[in-house]
Amino acid sequence: MVSNNAVIIKKYLDSTAGYPVIGEHLAFEKREFDLENAQVDEETPVLLKNIYTSVDPYLRMRMQSPKHASYIPPLELGKPFYNSTVAKVVKSTLDQYKPGMDVVFVSGWEEYTFVSKQALGFLQPINNPYKLPLIDFVGSLGMPSQTAYCGLKHIGKPKAGETIYISAASGAVGQMAGQLAKAMGLHVVGSVGSDEKFKICLDSGYDSVFNYKKESPFKALPRLCPKGIDIYFENVGGETMDAVLENMNLQGRIIFCGAISQYNNPNPYRVKNLGMVLVKSLTIQGFIVANILPQYQEQYFEEMPKLIAEGKIKYKCDVYDGLESAPEAFIGMLQGKNSGKTIVKIADE
């Protein structure tokens, strides 16, 4: 027998009810697994050993009860969280997934996961011509980076010389959006919530950064964007949007990626300046990366691994060691304690 420990959801928590509590809403659970006698068959043809898993804000929305479900169904009570994960094939009945193969899968926060035949479409072998570290496939090449890339291309439609403002600028999406925007010839401004994050952004190429805990966006944006804002990459929500709307240029584009400041807020902020959308002919568009990634996936994997291998893209990750640390990693990320992309290392490679 081996361990197959997991992090499970114990109780739903709606978005206005505050932050999840370890032990009440999610918990680390010790389990055993008979690996030697585990069978793969027609219904579950692949068994994976999970190595690295991604920790992302959208999982908070999966903790809402079914009556308040978001764009994605809630997690099933008593079952593991699951998200994009680097894993290794342990057993397989299929020639295209041989034991020892490295893959990316939407896998459970557990040590071992069976893949059903219905889920095989999500099981992607890792193509790694530049010999990048495996962690990069949930880090610098993972879903948040894909989100930054697709959001900029699909909604931002950037033109060299324009100004882009990115909130949560050192986060999983923000740090990649900033570097990509800079490579596209934009003037890049970001906001963060700590001096450490401030430095991370400057080191990664941002032209200007401000700490919103020290300076209001209503004061900082006119100072740092004297020519106005052409593109806003929205990651935080709240009053920042009102400050942005005051400073947007005509026909500006707002990429609505997330609103992490509101996910656990019992009194959600209501935007007051929506009239500016009409007056300035603005475009505000939300998006789910899974819906538009197919249009950009081939281009993304042609461009991004090479840029990372050449050191032209820097990407900071906060890596937690051991599955038992996942609840702390998740809640810390929601509270803004992370200074980069949050990842949990489940096992050695």
UniProtKB/Swiss-Prot annotation:
Principal location listed in the UniProt entry: cytoplasm
UniProt-listed SMART domains: PKS_ER
A single Gene Ontology CC term: nucleus
Compartments where found: Cytoplasm; Nucleus
GO MF: oxidoreductase activity, acting on the CH-CH group of donors, NAD or NADP as acceptor
The UniProt record lists the keyword Membrane: no
EC number: 1.-.-.-
Keyword Repressor part of the UniProt annotation: no
Keywords: Cytoplasm, Nucleus, Oxidoreductase
Record-stated family: Belongs to the zinc-containing alcohol dehydrogenase family. Quinone oxidoreductase subfamily.
Name of the protein this chain belongs to: Zinc-type alcohol dehydrogenase-like protein PB24D3.08c
Lineage, highest ranks first: Eukaryota, Fungi, Dikarya, Ascomycota, Taphrinomycotina
